């Protein structure tokens, strides 16, 4: 839910909000000569006021994705002279201390004013919004280092304490102090114990006349049952892992690599900042370098950080090195490591955002990075799992084992709590070769606990309730059957069918389930012709791709195929842009863009997509038309000023994104779809889904000739 944000200059005695782009007027020193006019035109210094980490801490966690563009025209050949004791050029250490003292004095005054206001009014205060920046630097390419012109440069800065100063070259004079304030939100107060999207503490953003400076501030999306949306939850986890050192720790006489303490995780989660940056030549002037940066900031109180860490444990993203499970995340004294599932999620986040930090790459290259997760399809509006029969059958094939059952020789080994057998996600649930159930000896049986363990460790489920729901659907669709109930376990109200995630509940694969997973010969496909939703025969690759994209089960298989083919970014971009444009048209229809905050937030999302998929050298750079790429670059790097021009800019960006989406659609339909339909690994499954008429002729094609698929890689990592 977007928050209301207003920007207005403050008078000398006005109390600043908890987040301010603070730009004090220069104070001439009696001992320092005034700077020359030429020097003042060449450069200026912006000093940010150090602020406390949370002047008004209500215990609300926050998450915000911000993006902005600031144009600063500095002649490439201009050099800035130095003046001792002056704010122009290089500043001596003594004067830095004087600026810090001035900053502290102004901060103390601001906090005093805040306190006086708090004693005379009932209105509540929250942390307010800040913004990232996209800066356009007027420097020649010859003046840049190799790292600057090499393309996408991700930034993973250390945690910010909310204080500090920055220096920014600009030809513009200082502007009046501006503040961002936020109105209290009653809904937020009712959701005090949920993760919330609010702004970061401080960003040192210079203000210039030609700028696009937007702030994105919104509540973190929550589901009906008060859990964060899966994508946001995984992004929060991955950002935390990138911020940690993940070095070696010793426990008694054992050394554990790539680990972290519970205290480090809680402290870092209290204030996280992730930035991704992209440098490229200006399409209109190659001698200028344009830098686009998207900043995401998470912030929350200590107890909430502890609760979120426990959610990471419950989702099997991290685990204690001693293998012991605790229902409450310890404040200190415990050592944790990423699970294979957590490493896989971190890897996908790093590939999308181009993260190449050495300590993260070491984890991704470690022997523990073996998992191939089943990426479950979710509803974009509610985040609920797709639960149609076809999608559940796709999940079931991996659950049961595509190459046969994962049989253990004894009941004790099949029922053990060890999860090492699931380290790669390519084998099915652990089954006992023979088990006595009542008076019968049954083959290939498994427990209810083994089923939910596999679903939690080998798929993108994030809480146990989702695993039970999927297992219930296995029973409902006749894929598994119960052989022995756990009578000591109470029945769950409002459940679809009875499924018990217990060690004492015994289940087996039905005959239909064995046919679905390929253990038994399939029935002969029906000789029918199917049509798409518009009644048009699917006689073209475009229509075939439309059918695949509209079917969650086929879309899941198609994504897996593209991942093995090293071009999954095409489908990811298509789906992400579909969500973005759908939201845009929905807001536009109801007049939501009359609010400047909605425009700024939507533009921030647009820059996130652009930096990930479309900017030159981005980690998941797409293969699109050169002219379209230049049009996108020109539009995304153009400075705008007032709210009307930002809305016009957003409209143009949406049109260009839709053109890029069409280009990617044509690429997938002409190149990927024919190969997907001819792949022998999927041909039998496609027949089972009544899409046998989609399968084209010609030789078979498979990007994965071996049993173990090649890992997904972003385009920037391919050689």
From Swiss-Prot:
Residues 214-411 are annotated as: Fungal-DR. Residues 123-135, 158-171 have a biased composition (Low complexity). One of its GO terms (biological process) is positive regulation of sterigmatocystin biosynthetic process. InterPro entries: DEP_dom, RGS, RGS_sf, RGS_subdomain_2, WH-like_DNA-bd_sf, WH_DNA-bd_sf. It comes from Emericella nidulans (strain FGSC A4 / ATCC 38163 / CBS 112.46 / NRRL 194 / M139) (Aspergillus nidulans). Residues 1-39, 117-141, 155-190, 694-719 are annotated as: Disordered. SUPFAM superfamilies: Regulator of G-protein signaling, RGS, Winged helix' DNA-binding domain. It holds the Pfam family RGS. It comes from the Eukaryota. Residues 425-511 form the DEP domain. Required for asexual sporulation and normal colony development. May be involved in brlA activation. Could play a regulatory role in controlling the flug-initiated signal transduction pathway that triggers the asexual reproduction. Residues 540-685 form the RGS domain. This is Developmental regulator flbA. Keywords: Signal transduction inhibitor.
